[in-house]
Amino acid sequence: MSQAYTPGLKRKEATLIRKTRMLPIPGKIIVDVGDTVSKDTVVAKAETLGEPEIVKVCAILGIDPDQIEKFMVKQEGDSVREGEAIACYRALFGLIKSDCFSPIDGTIESFSSITGQAIVRSHPKPIDIDAYIPGKVVRVIQDEGVVIETYAAFIQGAFGIGGESHGEIKMASKTPSDVLTGDRIKPDCEGKVLVGGSMVTAKALKKALEVGARGILVGGIMDEDLTDFLGYRIGVAITGHEKTGLTLVATEGFGRMNMLEKTFRILQRNEGRTACINGATQIRAGVIRPEVIIPIPSPGDASAASVLAEEELSGGMEVGTFVRIIQEPYFGQAGHICSLPSELQHVETESTVRIVEVELESGERVRVPRANVEIIEE
């Protein structure tokens, strides 16, 4: 059978999901294999070293470096508070006084009789990694992280902003073609993940943030609306660290793009359930897609279901595969592959390429270069 390979997005009504939760540095894992966790359960902890601050003790006190030990009132390893004296100089029966204070809360790490300086290091900063999704711990990676498994609906988006968030799904649009505008967002949207149709406006994003919504899932967004909302023009190579207070996942891409019917139906059927969403996007090496995970009741034998791990992306394209066209003149339209001719074909650009024949949802059959489609995994 003729087959080709192309990038794709996953849309699953129900599958076993495995998420790896890793510490940025070695630390302590506080759950075991078999443990059941909620989305908020802390599964791993670590501490990063605090920042060092150099204090010019001798210069401040007006003494020679080799005298520093004599006048230090705090020793190596001692805790200090910001503004607390770490060294004091007294002369002429106390008539001449000079003090050196700590610039931060922290610990005296060292002081030198060569440089006349002390190093105060701020307290370690704790790092807590939560489970993100409710489920069961199926693997522990010693000192590094865990793998959590859950049964869920799963949707990968094309672009997103904002980090991990959670909220109850609420339909804010009636059809996949509706535009999500500010007048559709009410006070009862607080804490919710709102589902729009083809597009969301900047006013709607601002209104959602104002009422306390946790996220927005929509087909597309105009670049100017995104810039208006963020206050600056974003680079799309790596996102997810924006401090917006709202996570956005565009399931189809930029512009006004109807959300795929299947995607809209999945979200519609799961209205009222909690969604775990992440807008992080990376289009460079090590591709990261924004995602929506909706934990659902597990069937009797969930272990028999196919497991969807984060690194899996088959890329297989064959007759019957559901794809979306990502270039004009059929940009945004979707359908099933009806043939994959092996012979090279001439296209309008006068280049010679391999093509794919797609039967669009409208019933029309079109031929486009294989590079101009992406898989929507069903």
Predicted feature residues:
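Well-ordered secondary-structure scaffolds
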Residues: 1-378
